[in-house]
Amino acid sequence: MPPKQHRHQKKDKNDNALQNTIGFVPPGATLASVSGYRPPDAFVNRIDRNIPVPARLRHTPVSLIEAVNDFHYAMMNDEERNNFYYEVLKKHVTPETGVLEIGAGSGLLSLMAAKLGAKWVVAVEGSEELAKLARENIRANNMEHQVKVLHMMSTELKSKHLPEPPDVLLSEIFGTMMLGESALDYVVDVRNRLLKPTTKIIPQFGTQYAVPIECDALHRISSVSGWRDLDLKHMMTLQDTVSIVFAKHYGIRMNSVNFRRLSDPIELFRVDFSSSNRNDIPRRKHFDVVAKESGTAHAMLFYWKVTDDEFVMSTDPEDTVNNFPRDMQWGQALQLLDASNGPLPTPVVFTEGKNYNFECNFSGDRVILHMQLCPESGNGEMTECEGKTT
């Protein structure tokens, strides 16, 4: 039977409390009653009045247009991503299966579930514009009898909006950093309120990795020492060794530049979306890293792998060589490294076989993290980091 129809009803104040605990709000989402929320600016207001803007774009939130053109098209054309979801869904969807998707976007994954014969599919999307387009896509595929789109945040979703508790919870709300779009928090919220113990969560597992790398190409665009006989090193005072930057924002694909991994991958955390919670990831963790090669660790490279059954979806540069869309939607992330907290950054130099202690600090919502090399003691042993942490 098709899902019950509901108008977009007045928000419960408890919805606000739920949403305010989650760090990421998707582009174009409508959250007028959430604390600190500002209505999205219309695209036409960002364009010089002498430049013509098509009517289809004029009043659309600028953040949504930027997001769709920045990564949504690439995401929908990532064949390996699409096949990952289709193959996992194929193992779990039957004519008796009810499917709930959160962060539905274009509705593609919900359409997959319907195509595979799900009894009903409810697609939840926080952006009014995307929800409308998802409905159009569903109508274009003659699946409106199976798939219903609800314009609301998943934190606003109630059991009354669903025909029954879903058999499958489906989502693809990962960022360049695996939890960069608060994927765990959104899944946990729905899991705690709306799922039954037997609900299959797709995908189920995910692991965030980091690895120190030597990369001359990155070094040349993120630092300076001088030109000919001119000393310019004081410009390094402003080098950002705190922020995590997406590789594509540097204008590079990591698999198209030469770099060396100076250690084995560091498993920062592992998540089981069917049981893990935010607090399962400590706010601070230490990692002993053994150098497998000597060299200068210019940066920490971040990537993730999501798995379900035998299927894997990965942003490791080795796994995206032939997947340009994957690198344009997610790619990898980088954090430049500093061996000290001095007036100028100090290179992190690795010696093969030597042990290095790194500290990883997470933001309260676990969306943001930072890697820091702990200094050596006088006897050559690594010590606890002394940088500012909370």
Swiss-Prot record:
Its Enzyme Commission number? 2.1.1.-
InterPro entries tied to this protein? Arg_MeTrfase (IPR025799), SAM-dependent_MTases_sf (IPR029063)
Q: What is the protein's known function? A: Arginine methyltransferase that specifically catalyzes the formation of omega-N monomethylarginine (MMA). Has activity toward multiple substrates in vitro. Able to mediate the arginine methylation of histones and myelin basic protein (MBP) in vitro; the relevance of such results is however unclear in vivo.
Per UniProt, subcellular location reads as: Cytoplasm
In Gene Ontology terms, what is a biological process of this protein? peptidyl-arginine N-methylation
Keywords assigned: Cytoplasm, Methyltransferase, S-adenosyl-L-methionine, Transferase
> A Gene Ontology MF term for this entry?
identical protein binding
Name of the protein described by the UniProt record: Protein arginine N-methyltransferase 7
Q: Where is the composition biased (Basic residues)?
A: 1-11
Q: Where does this chain mainly localize?
A: cytoplasm
**What sequence ranges are listed for the domain SAM-dependent MTase PRMT-type?**
55-372
Top enzyme category: transferase
Highest taxon listed in the record's lineage? Eukaryota
Record's Gene Ontology CC terms?
cytoplasm; protein-containing complex
Please describe the quaternary structure of this protein.
Present in large multiprotein complexes.
> Which gene carries the instructions for this protein?
PRMT7
Q: Where is the segment annotated Disordered?
A: 1-20
The record, for PANTHER family, names:
PROTEIN ARGININE N-METHYLTRANSFERASE (PTHR11006), PROTEIN ARGININE N-METHYLTRANSFERASE 7 (PTHR11006:SF4)
Q: Which family does it belong to?
A: Belongs to the class I-like SAM-binding methyltransferase superfamily. Protein arginine N-methyltransferase family. PRMT7 subfamily.
Query: Which Pfam families does this entry report, sorted A to Z?
Result: PrmA
**Active site, per annotation:** E172, E181
